[in-house]
Amino acid sequence: MQPTFVLVHGAFANSFSFAPLQAELGLLGHRSVAVDLPGHGFQATFTRAYQSPQDPEGLATAPGSIKGITLADNVAHLIGILERAKRNGPVILVGHSRGGITITAAANARPDLIDRIVYVSAWCPVRLDVNDYYAEPEMAGVDPAAFASALVGNPAELGLLRVNFRTAKPDSLAAFKEAFFADGTDEQFLTFLNTFQPDENLDVGGSADRAQPATWGRVPKTYVRLVDDAGLPLALQDRLIREGNELTPDNPYDVRTLAGSHLKWLVDPAPAARALGELATLPAPSARA
């Protein structure tokens, strides 16, 4: 039976970023659904202060619809989509970047709805909370200035993270490009940057949201490594794979590797679409034993 790929975006992103990938999947004969987590997509806040000419003071204080949204809200929303998708047959759940936190928590809660879980350079916390991984050696080369230089307002007062992706500051744009799309042209980079929304929620979960062997560990899983990713470095991706395998040695990751940066696979999606398409007929680990 044909599976449905359910695609979950990362921070500051939305379903729009999956459009090229969905086109490739569709042309290969695969069905897919791109999710907008709560407060994303057409639920996002784009204030007039964000338009040109920008109003920096207004942008720093304007309320955002994503305020108060939690990881639990994201998971509940995703589970509702998984329940609908599951009525049509097998479900392959795919998360990118911060989306990995949500798909991990969803697999902890409802493994019965997921036939395979796929991380594309995505977070899957096992031994540490996500924020704590940033202090680990694998993340030493990640420069927080990429976001800090364009951060707007006080997150504690706003109740959200706000980044001015429409900044014209050369240093900020250079930091964004280096972190996420160093192998793209300037035109591709700026186009992708304009699909981002300025606001993201604050909740990245805690120890209870780490991968749980009794539930998450039952789901066949794949990790797609992005070799040139500077935002989620390959060393950290490999550590997450290793920790996941140690947690569930009888259900190890099926590991795939793609060349390119954090965003390249979404702009040039043919290799990723082929890799994902191969998973549609991949048997579960128990069936391969």
What kind of feature is each model-predicted range?
Residues 10-13, 96-98, 123:
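Active-site glycine-rich loops that stabilize anionic/oxyanionic intermediates
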Residues 12-20, 32:
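Serine-hydrolase catalytic-loop signature spanning alpha/beta hydrolases and amidase-signature enzymes
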Residues 25-61:
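Conserved alpha/beta-hydrolase
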Residues 74, 86-97:
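Alpha/beta-hydrolase fold nucleophile elbow
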Residues 100-111:
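Short glycine-enriched nucleophile-adjacent loop
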Residues 108, 114, 118-163, 204:
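Flexible "cap/lid" loop of the alpha/beta hydrolase fold
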Residues 194-260, 265:
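Conserved serine/cysteine hydrolase catalytic core
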Residues 248-289:
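Catalytic active-site module of serine/aspartate enzymes centered on a nucleophile-bearing elbow/loop
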